[in-house]
């Protein structure tokens, strides 16, 4: 049986979880059709998800259709949980992008579509809620072609949901990537050729089939299920080779911790030793997507227990693989968290294990912690989970924008034995690096000049100290070079280097100087042409730098670089300035000096 790892993605309230529930029910995987409103869906397993009616964490469920075993990955729709979506996208064979026939193409829909396209994920579009009052048909198809991709092919009728034969309109789309279809215009259209090309081009993410239906009533779902079978590529479980997989989630079940991974090649079973970037370990449990102990083959989803060092993003079978670059913007807010209750650090560390971008770190007051956030909904969810799962009543400060520090120039400092209380010599040079290069560390001093434990103590301390620069923000994009070392055996201990290194680094940073940089967003705004002047005024008022607007008939588009801290203000003002017809898509655009 071939395997398909299928993601379901959408903007919030498009009906994504309802579609997941319908696919599971119609395939016989569940006996009862749950509902989001009823709080009894299979993939929204957390009490908090059921109460709020939103998906917070990606969840995996399994069903069988024809000769396919489908691992269905339901992802969050709210933009505050976009990190969950990003982790899931990297392990998919195909995706269903859900749109609401009532709300239409939303800004987050466009962000998701753009990301799926950049990853080359074969994608089916499902227009949900076709039975609702206010549902749009032809006009929505026009919006899909204009805002998402012109390379779409409707596969059933939006009016009666009957199958649509592949005719001239489909051939015109398929001919863009097929000389055979182009030739068929002369020789006469061959439906079998068109179907073969639809399958091929869907699998290569060149075209995007569109299905209409209703997850609640089940209308159009049979056609969608057949499209999943016919059009989306599958993984071959017989794929041989060395173990290769990616950890995309951390779960806790029955008091045990599991790393959830998708395998791309090889096999994995209990007691196998697994190598990854930060070490290796032996799996004491290997469960399949249905929580049964099994041997997992290529294409499968494995829940791996017993290896505490496994983290999200780790590549199984490789000790050298580097993480994939982020495709969604990082969190640009942070808040200080305090609590009178014990267990704050343990609770937040647990949540950060599931979502590393929370990035828990020490706060300004004793016992306080700082967390990174995407928005208010995520803050509310973290507070609720701390209270319900760990008995911790946490208070959050007002979120502030996360800035960073970049070096102005090169700085160098040396402190030798005898000059301080520490029996050690350390010299460090710090210099600006390339944008997005992170913190790099290298040796100029001879590697054998210090025992390995002392070398490790220096590097670890450098990286930890750069988390808080001279102006209170993280220092980024720099190269740190260890230039001088010295010790006195047997008096010197690792603590001498851990205590001396921050002093040397502080002096080097003071000589280099730093500049505070704020996060920026590239905002693309679509609006009626008559709203251009007021929107431009808004962008300038919020510190943005707009480009020349592009006007096409009665609509217009403008791109601007704006501070992340003002983005929410722009989003809130836009509907009033455009009579509800303005849409904004933002992507992280790096950092800019204040």
Outline where the language-model segments fall.
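Charged, conformationally dynamic linker/hinge segments
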Residues: 321-437, 455, 459-461, 500-521, ...
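P-loop NTPase switch module centered on the Walker A-proximal segment
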Residues: 1-99, 139, 143-154, 174-177
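Conserved nucleotide-binding/hydrolysis micro-motifs of P-loop NTPases
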Residues: 14, 30, 78-79, 102-105, ...
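Active-site phosphate-binding and catalytic loops of NTP-dependent enzymes
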Residues: 30-37, 41-58, 150-156, 207-208, ...
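Conserved nucleotide-binding/hydrolysis modules and their immediate coupling elements
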Residues: 231-233, 239-335, 345, 368
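P-loop NTPase catalytic nucleotide-binding module
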Residues: 1-14, 32-33, 102-253, 268, ...
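Charged, surface-exposed alpha-helical interface/stalk elements
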Residues: 519-594
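Long hydrophobic segments that form regular secondary structure
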Residues: 266-273, 277, 352, 360-363, ...
